[in-house]
A protein has these predicted regions:
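Conserved short loop/turn motifs at secondary-structure junctions
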Residues: 1, 109-111, 188-193, 267-270
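Intrinsically disordered, low-complexity regulatory segments
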Residues: 1-169, 173, 250, 260
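Long, highly charged, low-complexity internal segments
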Residues: 35, 43-84, 192-270
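Active-site-adjacent bridging/hinge elements
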Residues: 93-94, 175-179, 262-270
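Short, residue-level hotspots on alpha-helical faces of the histone-fold
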Residues: 124, 173, 177, 199-203
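Short helix-capping/linker segments at secondary-structure and domain boundaries
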Residues: 129-130, 177-182, 208-213
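Amphipathic alpha-helical segments of the small helical/lid subdomains adjacent to P-loop NTPase cores
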Residues: 164-195
């Protein structure tokens, strides 16, 4: 039996219909020598500081730099503690059973860095050693799936893609965990979240918000010239803007006296 793992149930159903896996089981579809299963996005991620013995926010703990990152099922917060998501744990058990029974694995997670990481984290967390190949497609039509299955690629070709995603994941953890705790301790009240991506994004939003609040409308003038060519009337606007009417009028007189205009751009609209 071959196992095909997709990133989400809807994709798995599309692949299953192509390979003839139409018998529904708990967490997968089976038939014609295939078991088509799925993740729900990231089933496995990096463990929180508590897994390394660091409880609470304490200055003496910082920076938290794990010698080796631990993988755990996706967790949800209950009160002040994180617990494994029960639905994720169930699906991981389904995957463990299928991986143990299969001859090989076809990786059908999304064709990209995060899709690669989703599978590799599950594969490593379960301690799987079965060989795997990659279904690399950007379309989910039946034709694209069949073509991709005829041209499966060696999983090792995507090792560097996985390492890139792994480095991103660990960098996010190091920056997010340590910076958030340091910021919260420095502020002295509440919990403040800081992240490698979220904080620069928030800074851009705040900057735009301040610009909007500080914006003061001002009046400016542009020159409009109406003319005709080949019996077609049209108007031309100057690119330059003038802060006062006097400057605009002076430039208009200059153009009027010269009698010539230079067309710098043309836009066609229907």
């Amino acid at each position: 039996m071959k196992v095909i793992i997709a990133e989400k149930p809807s994709v798995a159903q599309g692949i299953a219909s192509v390979v003839g896996a139409r018998q529904r089981k708990d967490g997968y579809l089976t038939g014609d020598g295939y078991a088509v299963t799925w993740a729900f996005g990231h089933l496995v991620g990096l463990a929180m500081p508590e897994s390394y013995g660091f409880s609470g926010f304490r200055r003496e703990h910082l920076p938290i730099l794990p010698q080796e990152f631990r993988l755990v099922p996706r967790q949800v917060r209950e009160g002040k503690v994180y617990k494994d998501d029960p639905g994720v744990v169930r699906q991981l058990e389904v995957l463990r059973e299928l991986f143990d029974r299969c001859e090989s694995i076809i990786v059908a997670t999304d064709a990209g860095r995060e899709g690669e990481l989703i599978f590799r984290y599950v594969y490593n967390y379960l301690g799987c050693t079965k060989p795997f190949v990659r279904l690399w497609i950007s379309s989910l039509t039946d034709k694209a799936i069949r073509e991709g299955l005829r041209n499966l690629r060696e999983g090792s070709l995507y090792d560097n893609l996985y390492l890139s995603a792994k480095a991103r994941s660990e960098a996010d953890w190091l920056v997010g965990i340590n910076s958030s705790q340091a910021l919260s301790l420095a502020a002295g009240q509440g919990v403040f979240s800081l992240g490698r991506v979220q904080t620069p994004t928030l800074a851009m939003i705040c900057s735009r918000y301040r610009e909007n609040k500080q914006f003061k409308p001002r009046t400016y003038f542009r020159i409009k010239v109406s003319t005709a060519k080949d019996g077609i009337d049209f108007s031309a606007w100057s690119q330059d803007r003038f802060d006062d009417l006097g400057s605009a009028t002076a430039k208009f007189r200059e153009v009027e006296n010269d009698g010539k205009l230079v067309v710098t751009s043309v836009e066609y609209r229907e």
